[in-house]
A protein has these predicted regions:
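Helix-adjacent hinge/juxtasegments
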Residues: 30, 34-68
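Beta-rich strand-turn-strand
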Residues: 66-89
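Short, Lys/Arg-rich amphipathic alpha-helical interaction segments
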Residues: 102, 106-139
Length: 139
């Protein structure tokens, strides 16, 4: 089942499903709202139509994306292609990413998490807290 917090977030936006596509950053499945995929599509469309990188992004994200509808219990059916990409066989882990989430094979995520924590620590100065808030909370 899709995490209740995310399915409720999508329901509030008027969606009864989620867009999924294979991550090109790691062996996971990216999941997002229709609004998010439209923003990604607009960003890709803003690239020069004759540049190779535009085709790379369009193929890797848009051509591979699938609109999956929730069933009555908030579940989605992932395609074999998506499951193979994430190397998911028996169990899967839903990992929240703010307004999106990823679906991982649990052992692969645990390995990724170690690397992610190290890199986040090295890059922590890049998080500009005060730019995201109007009050003095982050100062």
């Amino acid at each position: 089942s899709v995490p209740a917090s995310f399915s409720s977030y999508l329901s509030n936006l008027g969606y009864n499903g989620v867009i999924c596509y294979p991550s090109f950053n790691n062996s996971s499945i990216e999941a997002c709202s229709q609004d998010r995929i439209e923003k990604i599509s607009s960003a890709i469309d803003s690239l020069n139509p004759f540049e190779e990188k535009r085709d790379f992004f369009a193929t890797s994200i848009l051509a591979e994306s699938t609109n999956l509808q929730f069933d009555n219990e908030g579940r989605i059916s992932l395609s074999l292609k998506l499951l193979k990409h994430a190397k998911i066989k028996n169990s899967m882990l839903f990992v929240g990413q703010g307004q999106t989430f990823q679906i991982w094979e649990p052992t692969a995520f645990e390995k990724f998490k170690v690397t992610a924590r190290k890199k986040a620590n090295l890059n922590r100065a890049n998080l500009k807290w005060e730019k995201h808030f109007n009050n003095n909370e982050g100062k």
